[in-house]
Amino acid sequence: MVTAEFNPLGPDALSNPYPGYKILREHRPVHWNELFEAWIFARYDDVDAVLMHPRFSADRAKARTRFSEMVRQQQEQFGPFSQAPTMLTSDPPEHTRLRRLVSKAFTPRAVENLRPRIREIINGLLDGVAGRDTFDLVDEIAYPLPVIVIAELLGVPPEDRADFKRWSNDVVATLGGPFTSPDVIERARASLQEMVTYMSGAIAERRANPREDLISGLIAAEDDGQVLSEMEIFSTTILLLIAGNETTTNLIGNAVSSLLKHPDQLELLRSDLSLMPSAVEELLRFNGPVQATGRVAKEDIEVGGVTVKEGQVAFVLLGSANHDPAKFPDPERLDLRRRPTDHLAFGDGIHFCLGAPLARAEAQITLQALIELYPRIEMAGEPTWGGTFIIRGARKLPLRV
C-alpha cells in the first residue's frame, strides 16, 4: 500500500519535487495532511477549482488550525505592518479596490515600454562578465536584474539596491511558516524593520516632492474617489518589492537550468526566437518558481471528492498541477512548442499574479540576450537549489560559455 504524503521537509522538496508530485497525483491526489493541518490538492482540476472558487479566502487569518495560529504568532513578531492588507492576502471587495488602484502600473502597455530599459540592464550585467569563460548566472544576472528593475520602478537609488535585495530575501525565507528556524525569523524581523524605516521616509518624501516613480503613483492613485491609505501604500510597496525580486530570480534561473538540461530545446529556441513567448510559458509550466499556495474555506466546500470545512486550509500544489498528464500530455517532457497558456505558475482567478507581464518580459529578454551573445553555453557544474517548498529556485547555476 502506498502511503505517499506531501512532505515539504523531504530531501527532494527543493532539488526535484516533481517525482514526489507524480506519486501524490497517482495515489493520494487529495488527502488530509496532519503536519500542515490542511487538505493537500495535487491534480490540476482540483487545484484550479480551489483557486477559482469565490468561497475560498486568501486571508490566512480566517484559518482555524494550530498551523495558522503559529503563523499568526510569527507575524506578530514582525509588527502590525506585516498584517496590513495586501492584494495577496485580501478578498473582495478590499482586494478588488487594491488591485484596481495598483494595476495601472503593470498593464501590458506599461511593461512593453519597459522592455528597452530591461535589455539595457541585462546588457550591462553581461558586460560585467565579458571575457570570462565561466560565471554564475544567478549571482551575475538573475539575482541583480529584478532588483534593479523594481528599484528603478520604485525610485530607489542604486546605492540602496543591495539592501532591498537583502530585505526581500530575508522575508521570503520565512515562507516556510512554522517550519522556519528562529534565527531566520529574527533576521526577517530585523530586515522588515529596516524596510519600514526606509519606506516610511521614502513615502513621506514623495508626498512632499512627487516624482515619476511607482511610489508617487501609488500615493496619487485614485479610483472613484478612493485612494490608498498610508498603511496600504506601505504594504503594497513591500509586496511589490518582495514579489518582484525572488520569484523573477528563480524564474530566470529555473528556465536556464531547464534549457541546458534539454539541449535540443535550447537549439530549437536558438534557431527560432519567435518561439520565445511560448517557450517562457512552457518553462513556467515545466519548472516554475512558485510551487504552492494556500486558501481558507469561508464555508463548507466540496472539492475533489472531499469536504473542506469552514476554517480549514486547502493547500494547492501548483508545481504538481502543471505536471498533471490529464491536463498536459507527456508533462515531464519540455516542449517549447507546447503553448501551455493555461498553466498555473502565476496562479488563477482574482489573485492571478499582477506582475506576470513584467516577469515574462524579464525572462524573455534575458533568454534572448544569452542566446544572441553566446553561441555555446553549458553548465559548468550542477545547480544548487534553495528557497522553500513554496518558492524554490537555483541558488547557484555555474555556466561555461
Predicted regions and their residues:
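Cytochrome P450
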Residues: 1-401
